[in-house]
Amino acid sequence: MDVNPTLLFLKVPAQNAISTTFPYTGDPPYSHGTGTGYTMDTVNRTHQYSERGRWTKNTETGAPQLNPIDGPLPKDNEPSGYAQTDCVLEAMAFLEESHPGIFENSCIETMEVVQQTRVDKLTQGRQTYDWTLNRNQPAATALANTIEVFRSNGLMANESGRLIDFLKDVMESMDREEVEITTHFQRKRRVRDNVTKKMVTQRTIGKKKQRLNKRSYLIRALTLNTMTKDAERGKLKRRAIATPGMQIRGFVYFVETLARSICEKLEQSGLPVGGNEKKAKLANVVRKMMTNSQDTEISFTITGDNTKWNENQNPRMFLAMITYITRNQPEWFRNILSIAPIMFSNKMARLGKGYMFESKSMKLRTQIPAEMLANIDLKYFNDSTRKKIEKIRPLLIDGTASLSPGMMMGMFNMLSTVLGVSILNLGQKRYTKTTYWWDGLQSSDDFALIVNAPNHAGIQAGVDRFYRTCKLLGINMSKKKSYINRTGTFEFTSFFYRYGFVANFSMELPSFGVSGINESADMSIGVTVIKNNMINNDLGPATAQMALQLFIKDYRYTYRCHRGDTQIQTRRSFEIKKLWEQTRSKAGLLVSDGGPNLYNIRNLHIPEVCLKWELMDEDYQGRLCNPLNPFVSHKEIESVNNAVMMPAHGPAKNMEYDAVATTHSWVPKRNRSILNTSQRGILEDEQMYQRCCNLFEKFFPSSSYRRPVGISSMVEAMVSRARIDARIDFESGRIKKEEFTEIMKTCSTIEELRRQK
């Protein structure tokens, strides 16, 4: 029977059909090869947007720098970075006037945070540029390396464990005439293999000391490493993102803390909240504009798009904003917040791995590292690359490009939102002093502008005024990509508004299915995704039930764990059938052991082990959750785990799911091939780091975990904790006198060894 597809929509309001317009199901595109070209594009574009600014030279590093601030205003639509300082300061003053005390209060909140934050805050985050090894590392390792180098250079303030003291070391390190670092290197030797008698290359990893003079150190401290942004949908071209080093990160964190505190108090800000809270905030602004426009006014909304937001922002402007926001605050606080924008005005972009060349005729491949781009003959490159390199050459120093203007992606999201909101704030009638007025929403570079006026000419005038005000602050609204509609229909940060926010269920499609972490986590994540979509995305009961059945089917095919009484033959069916036959209570078997599915839409919030616990055979319970069973991994599992979900659009979301440690929550082993590479030394460092942390956890289990008060090293904290615990256990009779004496002796020995060291 043929079905006319339009019939499907007869009963559906038009706005609900949005889910059918999303093509984002399969895997998103990933980048391959080097990001060098994309980074050069970013650097060149950024300079082009500010080209009529003033050139200066950095006295310390000799890097040429372009300063577009207070530069000539653009005559036409071209995007440009010529923000005017006095306009930015005035916008800040008006923002404060409409929100009395907002800056003052946020500063007080931030000051508390600054004094309490521990340096381990910097271990959060994924890849970080490690300046000691000149490449990316996990954040914790990069921090450990930085602190190790600081201490070997006599910078000891960081020992207190407070972030602000670590930052004092960073500042002092920049005044040093030279800094000594430890780097890893590889030795290759040709040796004869005893067994096969062939020559083989043997690699050994060494660590060596290296001295950096002030200039080289500053260049590294100010370097942002670049990578290609992965998994971006709907774009043909990839683009570069930056990872800053440990020197910059701490300062940025404090600036963003201040800006976040301000954003929380601004009704037009789409950050830092998310999800339903964000929708409620936005709906309020829309409601306000529509209520006031009922009789005499008309109301229009622009779904806005800014051209190259990051590349036209300027750290010098952020410095002006911070100087204004903190103007009545103590000197130390103002200094610490002004360092991030100053470092960003002097930043260097690392060009990445360089270019790969291959000669088809000679079957040769060779890599041209970024350091060589400054003086290599350009005849080897194609036209577009040649143009890029010619343009960037005057900016190059040691394989990094001087990039004073522009911000790089994702660095000051909160602070740039404050700048955007300050323009929306100027739309009140008391500032426009005319018949039109505006309000709107801002979330980093995304905005929606609602304009009210008595007639169309007024709307046009309002939009023009908004557009020109943005230009004064270095924000470029794109006339090509923004569009205007009657208020009631617009899109903002991938939320579609049509008389209320429309649930766009298809955005979540990529996160349905089996994640491939392990049997335990996958089951838990799968049902949590369905539960969350019932709560947030209008996933109805019938569809949810169907999604659940499809998920279970998918799960069984992935892990080859079809029910014990099925006819399907897989590699595991022999074991599963055997287990099925010898189990009395078959309903108690987990799905991953060939058991039946007991989930329905009412019990999705319960972990499967808990759901079936009462139904399990006793010996099955014993095997499944026995802490002495070597296959039960307790090491990774806390009561709540986090999975990273990738929706079709927008940032990866952190999703919490419950997990129970069982024989199914295994953690895969590391790939062996890393052990033969230069990474090996780092891996060993990382494992040592891990062991120390695990040991510390044993002494301070999370249930009783209060941060050790006062300034003590990890060892001192553990020794004093061991003494206290031993005394309590001895006095309550839990341990014998001999054991107590032995513990005390061990503690003294450890202290003695530390003194000798």
Curated annotation (Swiss-Prot):
Q: What is its EC number?
A: 2.7.7.48
Residue ranges of the region described as Disordered: 53-82
Intrachain disulfide bonds: none
Q: Which InterPro entries match?
A: RNA-dir_pol_NSvirus (IPR007099), RNA_pol_PB1_influenza (IPR001407)
Q: Where is the RdRp catalytic domain?
A: 286-483
What PTM annotation applies here?
Answer: Phosphorylated by host PRKCA.
Placement of sequence motif Nuclear localization signal: 187-195, 203-216
Task: Enumerate the Gene3D superfamilies for this protein.
Answer: 6.10.140.720
State which residue ranges cross the membrane: none
Pfam families to which the protein is assigned, alphabetical: Flu_PB1
Q: Could you say which residues form the signal peptide?
A: none
What's one GO-annotated cellular component? host cell cytoplasm
Top-level taxonomic group: Viruses
- Its family? Belongs to the influenza viruses polymerase PB1 family.
Q: Please describe what this protein does.
A: RNA-dependent RNA polymerase which is responsible for replication and transcription of virus RNA segments. The transcription of viral mRNAs occurs by a unique mechanism called cap-snatching. 5' methylated caps of cellular mRNAs are cleaved after 10-13 nucleotides by PA. In turn, these short capped RNAs are used as primers by PB1 for transcription of viral mRNAs. During virus replication, PB1 initiates RNA synthesis and copy vRNA into complementary RNA (cRNA) which in turn serves as a template for the production of more vRNAs.
The protein here is known as: RNA-directed RNA polymerase catalytic subunit
- Name the source organism: Influenza A virus (strain A/USSR/90/1977 H1N1)
